[in-house]
Amino acid sequence: MTVTAPNALNFECETGNYHTFCPISCVAWLYQKIEDSFFLVIGTKTCGYFLQNAMGVMIFAEPRYAMAELEEGDISAQLNDYEELKRLCLEIKRDRNPSVIVWIGTCTTEIIKMDLEGLAPKLEAEIGIPIVVARANGLDYAFTQGEDTVLAAMAARCPTSTAISDPEERNPIQRLLNFGKKKEEVQAQSSQYHPHPPLVLFGSLPDPVVTQLTLELKKQGIKVSGWLPAKRYTELPVIDEGYYVAGVNPFLSRTATTLIRRRKCQLITAPFPIGPDGTRTWIEQICATFGIQPQGLAEREAETWQKLSDYLELVRGKSVFFMGDNLLEISLARFLIRCGMRVLEIGIPYMDKRYQAAELALLSQTCAEMGHPLPTIVEKPDNYNQLQRIKALQPDLVITGMAHANPLEARGISTKWSVEFTFAQIHGFGNARDILELVTRPLRRNQALAGLGWQKLVAH
């Protein structure tokens, strides 16, 4: 089925079999991001094996996540769910004493209809630790949506200003920027900001990237009131009705919906700060929302592109095919088209056209400016059909999930794991180089092998 959008982008929906990680993998980066948390995944042995393989076995460190393994007694309702979870949570409290316990529901808890949302408030009151329930199960479209589910649950837990005596104390980034300064200096610095409604940014990013984006907005006179998630659960941002929110990742549509509907926030619809072009447009949209004239962004973007010139020479004219895995595909395709690459197809497990509207508009604009034909966006791609198209098109690079990387390499097609873009620092002006470092690695390897004369794999 083909749908032609008003901006002439072609959308196809194949509803086929595609491969992506399980969303419970979000625990891998969220437990590191929220330092005072403990993640309890409630599932079967399969979930436990997956977590061990996906995150590695930590021998010397005690990780802040665990597996509550469902047994036959749980599934046949012979055991009391409440008592079993209470026993585990009391053990976690005794050993780790976290500020929050996050229960991660799985496919099995969905199938046996475990009422985690009903159990959590009673247990929370009994043990005295907040319990957040997130259904990050394999019924989702992509593994990154696990983070979306957790952040949507946490958005409902963000305090209001009436419940907090000093909201500024809950802003760790602001405290970091003001560290070592006298009170008078802090007050003088706060006068540099333009008057605007409070702004909260949502999306889990490494701390250096959080600081970079906060400083980029500070240069424009925009103060970030907080980030969701914060580094600590006790520092979740204050969110009141009428606050403005902006996302930094394309897979956070549930969180955006929760902030709009339940917390009555205003969503700033903007492309995502991936690549110099996306970062500039993201900042411009936030400035435009607050009626602020952006300063020096064109120069900042031009300077970044200049620093990328060595990589741009490598990728210009090369073709890339996205099989679809982590919902970053539209943003990455738009950036690579701006770099001079040819995008043959954008496969994506799920497309929220409202949340990604600004990103799709920027993709169309980028194609027009670069003289690139509008790529076809295939939602829920059928991997079998994709493999036939890859065989016919012979792209220089395929960005794919792990399942297809080795089979494609065996057929002489260069691949890059899409999961690497999830874990790499790809946001902001300064990190565009990291994206191109990942993209060009297979291309540079091919060049090096060709230089050695090793162009064919010979089987004996």
UniProtKB/Swiss-Prot annotation:
Gene responsible for this protein: chlN
Family annotation (InterPro entries): LIPOR_BchN/ChlN, Nase/OxRdtase_comp1, Protochl_reductN
- Determine if Iron is one of this entry's keywords: yes
* Superkingdom to which the source organism belongs: Bacteria
Presence of the UniProt keyword Iron in the record: yes
GO molecular function annotation: 4 iron, 4 sulfur cluster binding; ATP binding; metal ion binding; oxidoreductase activity, acting on iron-sulfur proteins as donors; oxidoreductase activity, acting on the CH-CH group of donors, iron-sulfur protein as acceptor
Which cofactor does the UniProt annotation name? [4Fe-4S] cluster
Q: What does this protein do?
A: Component of the dark-operative protochlorophyllide reductase (DPOR) that uses Mg-ATP and reduced ferredoxin to reduce ring D of protochlorophyllide (Pchlide) to form chlorophyllide a (Chlide). This reaction is light-independent. The NB-protein (ChlN-ChlB) is the catalytic component of the complex.
Q: How does it assemble?
A: Protochlorophyllide reductase is composed of three subunits; ChlL, ChlN and ChlB. Forms a heterotetramer of two ChlB and two ChlN subunits.
Listed under GO biological process in this entry are: light-independent chlorophyll biosynthetic process; photosynthesis, dark reaction
Residues the record lists as binding [4Fe-4S] cluster: C22, C47, C107
EC number per UniProt = 1.3.7.7
Pathway it works in: Porphyrin-containing compound metabolism; chlorophyll biosynthesis (light-independent)
Q: What class of enzyme is it?
A: oxidoreductase
Q: Which reaction does it catalyse?
A: chlorophyllide a + oxidized 2[4Fe-4S]-[ferredoxin] + 2 ADP + 2 phosphate = protochlorophyllide a + reduced 2[4Fe-4S]-[ferredoxin] + 2 ATP + 2 H2O
Cofactor binding: number and manner: Binds 1 [4Fe-4S] cluster per heterodimer. The cluster is bound at the heterodimer interface by residues from both subunits.
Q: One Pfam family, short name please?
A: Oxidored_nitro
Protein name per its UniProtKB record: Light-independent protochlorophyllide reductase subunit N
Return the similarity comment: Belongs to the BchN/ChlN family.
List the keywords (alphabetical). Answer: 4Fe-4S, ATP-binding, Chlorophyll biosynthesis, Iron, Iron-sulfur, Metal-binding, Nucleotide-binding, Oxidoreductase, Photosynthesis
